[in-house]
């Protein structure tokens, strides 16, 4: 996906799920032929097109302003030049725009431009906190450089996807399926949960989760990501 498409898609993904993000993105592309048309359109039309993503009254003007700001600075909406910049310089360029936080920038850099960046979404933030890969009180913003320092750059892509999968299928926000976790022995949080459930009897153990597998392997997965939090 071109970087400008990835940028708009990721802004739409903030505080929603993949399905609603995709519905809004496809609606926007169907309504307007180019990003220049989105940039110059009546804001109400843009807002109406992206309603499936939620927070349309905030996201619509935000997307248009980012598109205008990029045009003012670059003369076009082509972001391919970012691929030639050092990753930190490219990250700084993206995050100077209102509504483009570290996660949004990292997604554009990693998934569109092939840069070594590690996006931290809700799932990654939760899982890495539980297994001790980050300090408990570390903010999401602080987690980006911290986690990048822990993983070799060539593993960012696969690690990002696999931790998200773990968070969605097993290490869920409420009542995680710790008994199915492939790294349970490395997780004090999970071991404590298992001990509490064992003390409470069989009713404390959650039922089987469709799609969750005890044999989950940490391997490279199909190219898909994104998440449900902001920035």
Segments (PLM) and residue ranges:
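Catalytic cores of DNA base-excision repair glycosylases
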Residues: 1-209, 215-222, 227-228
């Amino acid at each position: 996906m071109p970087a400008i498409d990835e940028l708009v898609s990721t802004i739409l993904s903030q505080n929603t799920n993949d399905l609603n993000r995709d519905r809004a993105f496809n609606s926007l592309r169907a309504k307007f032929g180019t990003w220049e048309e989105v940039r110059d359109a009546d804001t109400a039309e843009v807002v109406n097109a992206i309603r499936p993503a939620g927070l349309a009254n905030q996201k619509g003007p935000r997307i248009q302003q980012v598109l205008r700001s990029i045009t003012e600075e670059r003369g076009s909406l082509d972001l391919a030049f970012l691929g030639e910049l050092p990753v930190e310089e490219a990250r700084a360029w993206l995050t100077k725009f209102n509504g483009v936080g570290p996660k949004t920038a990292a997604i554009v850099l990693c998934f569109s431009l092939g840069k070594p960046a590690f996006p931290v979404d809700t799932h990654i933030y939760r899982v890495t906190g539980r297994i001790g890969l980050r300090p408990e009180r570390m903010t999401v913003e602080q987690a980006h450089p911290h986690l990048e320092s822990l993983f070799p750059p060539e593993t960012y892509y696969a690690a990002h996807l696999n931790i998200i999968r773990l968070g969605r299928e097993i290490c869920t926000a409420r009542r995680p399926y710790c008994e199915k976790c492939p790294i349970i022995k490395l997780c004090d949080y999970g071991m404590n949960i298992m001990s509490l459930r064992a003390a409470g009897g069989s009713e404390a153990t959650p039922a089987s989760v469709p799609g969750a597998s005890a044999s989950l392997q940490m391997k490279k997965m199909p190219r898909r990501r994104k998440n449900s939090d902001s920035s």
